[in-house]
Curated annotation (Swiss-Prot):
Pfam family, one: Acetate_kinase
Organism from which the protein derives: Moorella thermoacetica (strain ATCC 39073 / JCM 9320)
Record site feature (Transition state stabilizer), residues: H179, R240
InterPro entries: Ac/propionate_kinase, Aliphatic_acid_kin_short-chain, Aliphatic_acid_kinase_CS, ATPase_NBD
Active-site residues, record numbering mapped to chain: D147
Name under which the protein is recorded: Acetate kinase
The family this protein is said to belong to: Belongs to the acetokinase family.
Localization: Cytoplasm
Manner of cofactor binding, per the entry note: Mg(2+). Can also accept Mn(2+).
Length: 397
């Protein structure tokens, strides 16, 4: 069966078409700048030259139609017609308390819409993508895979905030986490490499990018995770502040006269390594500036590293030990310096990496030093494949 996986953002659509016979990627692509000037489709079929098409793309329906036209194009296409697509899997950032992927029906769409308040940049566009597929490919089964689903295995004491219980119940306030599909994929892959069931392993996965989260995995379930009610919590990130004293929020609102929306912008868009460095939200820029002696870049870097080390140590305590540590996502897969800095002076936990093995970017590799108790890996994430697998399983059930 061929499965199309879609990831609809506020102004973009990413797609991959899988042949599930061998889980190969037949084509992948990206539509950018939906609804704004300069919109473009970049289509990359396996074994063929890429197609770049600049055209007006006013909405997600037009964007998805362009993706499908590229997939069936006489020269750049990889399928003859739409009927070859057996099912469609959608990445949904916020799934509330959905514990697993589900087939799309009216109740699923209603839930995604109601949860838009918790992920305004993501759930709305994803819902528009689902509705576009219903219009263009009527009758084709659709599946929603939720970034939050893997974290629904957390015990209640891990996801509960110590605010008035009634307020939390009324407003659905709890730890939801994010990047769940990525954390689950790399944990399963690491378990496969070491040749043991994930249920028997204590694992910490580090999804490090512009948005970062760390997850403790026990009995093959998420036991705790750094992101919380929203993806603002946890580590210092590219533009997000991560964990701060909550009293800072009303303090700044009073001192600076910020509205709630303005305060949200400060924490989500103007903070993190961008806010500390005053330079950039891109960790590559931070590394380069630090090498040139920029002290605020150094400070931003060290604040980030400190926050990551703190979560790894805390989660090793919660797990009562550690078997596997995994680095993934843009920074985790590609920054030699970030992995080295985070793992430095962690030998008391059994974590020690080999400097030569660590010279890797974007490739799967074990980087454990000889004699280290904890096995450390770099594993490129593959959320799309996880979504495709879930989609296939639900459609065939």
């Amino acid at each position: 069966m061929k499965i199309l996986v879609l990831n609809c953002g506020s102004s973009s659509v990413k797609y991959q078409l899988f042949d599930m016979e061998d889980e190969s990627v037949l084509a992948k692509g990206l539509v950018e700048r939906i609804g704004i000037d300069g919109s473009v489709l970049t289509h990359r079929p396996a074994g063929k030259e890429k197609l770049v098409r600049e055209t007006e793309i006013p909405d997600h329906k037009v964007a998805i139609r362009l993706c499908l036209e590229a997939l069936t194009d006489p020269h750049y296409g990889v399928i003859k017609d739409y009927s070859e697509i057996g099912a469609i899997g959608h990445r949904i950032v916020h799934g509330g308390t959905f514990p697993h992927s589900v087939l799309v029906d009216a109740s699923t769409k209603k839930a995604i819409s109601e949860l838009e308040v918790l992920a305004p940049l993501h759930n709305g566009p994803a819902l528009r993508g689902i509705e576009a597929c219903e219009a263009i490919l009527p009758g084709t089964p659709q599946v929603t895979a939720f970034d939050t689903a893997f974290h629904q295995g957390m015990p209640d004491y891990a996801y509960t905030y110590s605010l008035p219980y009634e307020l939390c119940q009324k407003h659905l306030i709890r730890r939801y986490g994010a990047h769940g599909t990525s954390h689950q994929y790399v944990a399963l892959r690491a378990a496969a490499i070491v040749g043991k069931p994930l249920e028997e392993l204590k694992v910490i996965t580090c999804h490090l990018g512009n948005g970062s989260s760390i997850t403790a995995i026990k009995n093959a379930k998420s036991y705790d995770t750094s992101m919380g009610f929203t993806p603002l919590a946890g580590l210092t990130m590219g533009t997000r502040c991560g964990d701060i004293d909550p009293a800072i929020v009303p303090f700044l609102m009073e001192k600076e006269g910020y509205t709630p929306a303005e305060m949200d912008q400060v924490m989500n868009r103007r903070s993190g390594v961008l806010g500390v460095s005053g330079l950039s939200s891109d960790f590559r820029d931070i590394e380069a500036a630090m090498a040139e002696g920029n002290d605020r870049a150094r400070l931003a870097w060290e604040v980030f590293v400190h926050s990551a080390k703190k979560y790894i140590g805390a989660y090793a305590a919660l797990l009562n030990g550690l078997d596997i540590l995994v680095f993934t996502a843009g920074l985790g897969e590609n920054s030699i310096a970030a992995r080295e800095a985070i793992c430095r002076d962690m030998d008391y936990l059994g974590i020690k990496i080999d400097p030569e093995k660590n010279q890797v970017r974007g490739q799967e590799r074990e980087i454990t030093a000889a004699g280290a108790r904890v096995r450390t890996f770099v594993i490129p994430t593959n959320e799309e494949l996880m979504i495709a697998r879930d989609t296939l399983a639900l459609v065939q059930a």
